Amino acid sequence: MKTFHLFAVLVTLPLLLVGCGEKAIVNDEELELHEGIYCLVGSDTPYTGKSFALYENGQKRSETNWKDGKMDGLWISWHENGQKGAETNFKDGKPDGQTIAWHDNGQKQSEANWKDGKLNGLKTTWYKNGQKFMKGNWKDGNKVSAKYWNPKGEPVNLFDETKTE
């Protein structure tokens, strides 16, 4: 009998330890904002782990990574039809790194680079038909330059107050 108990402990203990190392995954509805920091409802402790949101039809809407109550890591969203909507990296609650977004038909909608929550570098956007709409450069959140196209892919001149003569 002692052999059976020892065997049960040796098999069960590693499974329990693995389970303890996993981060919590909660529904976004279980989080609430406390002075700029997200916590589990009824708690003042900043949340660390993952959360998700669903559409009314049960389709996944988003998945968020949290660290100390702020978005941190990859955030992913989906359109209601199941097509991926966007991927953005966050650091300390601010976009940081590359963001890619897609129209609900799967065509790329935008691609941008962020640093400390501000657009920084190249940003490109596309029409739903796949034609390029805008390609521009940003520095510290300010547009430096941009070019525009119409839905047929022809260049257009739009007033751009960032240009100086």
What is the meaning of each model-derived region?
Residues 8-16:
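Bacterial N-terminal signal peptides
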Residues 16-165:
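Glycine/tyrosine- and acidic-biased, solvent-exposed loop/turn segments at the edges of beta-strands
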Residues 1-8:
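Bacterial N-terminal signal peptides that target proteins for export
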